[in-house]
Amino acid sequence: GKKNFLNEPDTWDVLEKVKKLADEFKVSLLPEIHASYSEKIYEVVANKGYMTYDFFLPGLLIYAIETKSGEVLAKWANEIQEKKIRVVNMLGCHDGIPLLDLKGILADDDIQKMIDTIVGRGGFVKDLHGAKNMYYQVNATYYSA
């Protein structure tokens, strides 16, 4: 009956146990955040003292290139600096270009336009849990996106 990501307080209990072990060996933990921007889970993780590994940058960069505007990308970058949120980001990975994460920082119409553009260039949409029209990510390279 629980969601599959960040179940409170269970997630924090597990992370604290692992952190105690990791601290003994001077190993830092890097929780992966795969949730919509509007949920602000990256802030919760940062407020608990962890760096965050999130997935906003790839889609925001493509959006900036496609719209010829860095406004939303700059807004996000300024926000993480102002709030002193320590992040690790990537531009691409084996999973594709994340889209679910952009909900809340981009309008749904803008996300759909990105999907349509990338699919029009040969990309594929990976739907969340197999549900049609419930986008999760686009499988494409930056070159073809």
Question: Residue locations for each model-derived region?
Answer:
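Active-site and adjacent substrate-binding regions of carbohydrate-active enzymes
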Residues: 1-145
